[in-house]
Amino acid sequence: MKGSCLCGAIRYEAAALSSPISHCHCRTCQKAHSSAYATTARVLREHFRWTSGASLLRSFESSPGKLRHFCTVCGTQLIAERPEQAHIILRIPTLDEDPGVTPTMHIWTSHDQPWTTENGEIPKYPEWPTAS
């Protein structure tokens, strides 16, 4: 599987996911991704490689020992890691292709925000809604 940041300056390849895809609702992921949750999966280090733009990566230690790596051009967070672990944590939305599997769980839902809803009570649009 191939992936990249928003501007395309950084590209990577991941041979296979090594865990199910999950939606992480922890407060750190909410802040880091400006979102209600982050969609992630583990990839073994030997199954991941940067193919271009690695010199444009910077990291931020978001909690003790956990590094989040992002593009210095567009700001896209691509992976997180704890260097002592055998895997990295891939940000699934940065894939340029369908991974062929869907998320299997939501984690850290105790951190859900009161303004989020996934129960189908609000309208959904395939694109931007027309003005009414």
What label would you give each PLM region?
Residues 1-132:
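A short Gly-Trp-Pro
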